[in-house]
Amino acid sequence: IFVERKPEIVFHAAALKHLPLLEGYPNEAYQTNILGTLTLLKASKNVGVSVFVNISTDKAANPISVLGYSKRVAERLTASFGNSTTRYLSVRFGNVLGSRGSVLVSFRDQISKGGPITLTHRNVTRYFMTISEAVQLVIQAGAVGKNQSVLVLDMGKPVSIFDVATQLIRSSNRPIDIEIVGLRPGEKLYEELLLNTEEMLPSHNPHIFIAQKEVLSPEHMLLIQSVLDRLNEPGFSDAMELIGLMKALIPEYKSNNSKFEVLDRV
């Protein structure tokens, strides 16, 4: 398709995003979120794509989950393909209202079945955007974003998921219970937009901020390549080794409420 159509701009939004699924099957996160991104980057470079926008997530900031680290690696890979004549950048944002698997869709489905609504924790908060807001800001980010940068979109204040559930129950006029089931592996109480080493800088658009410009050393590029070579060896399937390699690649990745926490104690 790339050779035939020769696109000039690519918006890369394909990803696996189901948190518990990826904690259980980290190789799937690698195959889709990392290797899939790398395949698109190579195809884009081969046909001379001038602008590549990688759609990332707030879970990539100080990641504690397989999903988060896989998207953080994708950010770094995207930056590594940029040069002086192109703009390869990433855009982080949070939950998109109404998208497949979003909390609103899940809650409404639970209400339609008579409940209960299941929450992982009473104090969980998340950032939200509408689909139209997300599309408009991603397109604008592609227009103003600089090469090798990571951009953050203005999503307003984080929203209490408990409050969302309460409002939906109230509007349904049905006696629906709320059940607290506990945080899932890799889940945060609140999402962060920036790494601990980043600061939010203004851009030409008041709703788009610059988190950082990725500058990857030659040594880090060699490390990325060596990790990818190991993961691509025939028959490789060791989840613990995969996560260990990713922790070497992304040192800010610290597992939480997960079987992979043991690797952080080594």
Each model region followed by its residue ranges:
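A generic secondary-structure signal
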Residues: E4, A43, Q140-A141
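Conserved Rossmann-fold cofactor-binding substructure of NAD(P)-dependent oxidoreductases
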Residues: I1-I9, G186
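Strand-loop microenvironment adjacent to phosphate/nucleotide-handling motifs in alpha/beta enzyme folds
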Residues: E75-N95, R100-V266
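Conserved Rossmann-fold NAD(P)-dependent oxidoreductase catalytic core, especially the SDR/UDP-sugar
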Residues: H12-E75, S80-F81
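Short secondary-structure boundary/capping segments
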Residues: E4, P26-E28, G68-V73, S106-F107, ...
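Short Gly/charged-rich anion-binding patches and loops
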Residues: K6, T39, V73, D163-V164
